Amino acid sequence: LVMLGGIEAVWGLRQLYGYAVSNHSLYVLTGSFFNPGPYSGYLAMILPVCLHQWLTKRGEILCSDRNDGKGWKKVMDKVGAMVAGGVMLLILCVLPAGMSRSAWLAAGVSCLCVYAWHMDWTDKFRLLWQQQRQRVVMVVVGGFCVLLLAGYLLFVLKPDSARGRLFMWKITCRAIAEKPLTGYGIHNFAAAYGNAQETYFAAGDYEPWEERVAGSPEYAFNEYLQVAVELGIPLAVCLLVVVVLCLYRGVRKGRYGICGAILSLMIFSFSSYPLQLPVFIVTFGGLLVACLSGADRWQWLGLAVSVGIIGGFRLKNDLQVEQACREWMNARVLYSAGAYQSAEKEYGRLYPLLRDRASFLFEYGHGLHKQQQFGKSNRILKEALLRSCDPMILNVIGKNYQQMGDCLSAEDWFIRSTHRLPGRIYPYYLLAKLYAEPGFRQPDKFEKMKRMVLTKEPKVHSTAIRQMREEIKKIQLIFVHIKKDE
């Protein structure tokens, strides 16, 4: 882990200084990840391991006797301390640039705990409490005030981002309340979240800032809530108890670095999505096993062999999916260029391997919509709804029904889209056009949607919004002429 942390830290420094390219067009710093959030969380997880190694090796060096006949061991301890300390400094150089408040908090708390375990602060605190209780209370109260101030400053750093997380957790809790015992099933978070958010906004009892920060997330940005949504509260509590027991066992065995890494990941999981990435799952599993395993080399060898066998069985399927993703990227070029007929053949061929990916299903369904295969498009897009809460899926399904002449169904889907993300102007525009259809003309509803399109403040002004508003004004003129003729 220390070596991997060093590689990631150097990778990040090279990106910061322009010697390497990041994996995201919007961010300079991503390491080997796709955005700086998980990258910062990974570094924060490794930092307490480095601190533990540095403290341990440094202590062994200070306690060793120069003439104890173990000069080679002392040299290795020095090398280990230098490597751990060097990687720790590299991580500390890169971590602030990631701008991840969750990672900063995770790194700070976990490193403090590792240092406290090494210095045996528990016994010292107990003794101090017996001797100077009043002073301890003052220090604790002061520390609590400092934490509140730090929390406020972290909130002010990115206020809309913080509000967005809070709103996301609020909707997630509403989804949990619908199925608290059984959950919605693995990989069904997005569908559950989308329906819960749709129901919430449809009621109309919400604050303006909630409409502004609402989105269509793939993850809950809180692993505890996400597990509760997918597996139910009882199973989520059981899994948490297992992790806490492993952590307790690790502390009892003196494996402070490993326990610090687990604690860091647990804190980071409160406001991010690390366990949605395979690298975190594998590392987390290894850390938990390391807390329970003894010092016997045969146990570790057996563990390594078991992991290798499981990985071997997974490898074939993973390679097939990876190859399918590469071919999807090639097919996406055809899709983006408007060659929908050629793209459809590729998407149809890749469908069995990539049918669990929402973006793939949306592109496939949208391409079918462009080819006027409306029924087949709806079937694919309704599958995408089980994997995503993106309102654009609802919009395209509604347009399919409109093209098939089922205006009532189209209206229902467009209205669902306005409830799922009321801050978007596009579904109101689609409803306005629907109410202007000759066979479905409804002037009163058109006027209401027209006002929404023309007066609603978008998050970002764009050419598309200007064009929609101009078209609605033209449709309004047609309505005026029709009224005059009548």
Each PLM stretch: what is its role?
Residues 151-167, 308-338:
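Hydrophobic alpha-helical transmembrane segments in integral membrane proteins
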Residues 355-356, 388-389, 422, 458:
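Short coil turns that delineate tetratricopeptide repeat
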Residues 1-27, 31-155, 229-258, 262-269, ...:
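Alpha-helical transmembrane segments of multi-pass inner-membrane proteins
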Residues 23-27, 186-229:
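Interfacial juxtamembrane loops and adjacent helix segments
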Residues 328-329, 359-363, 392-399, 426-430, ...:
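Alpha-solenoid helical repeat scaffolds
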Residues 336, 370, 403, 437-438:
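Register position in tetratricopeptide repeats
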Residues 440-486:
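Terminal, low-structured helical/coil segments at or just beyond the last alpha-helical repeat
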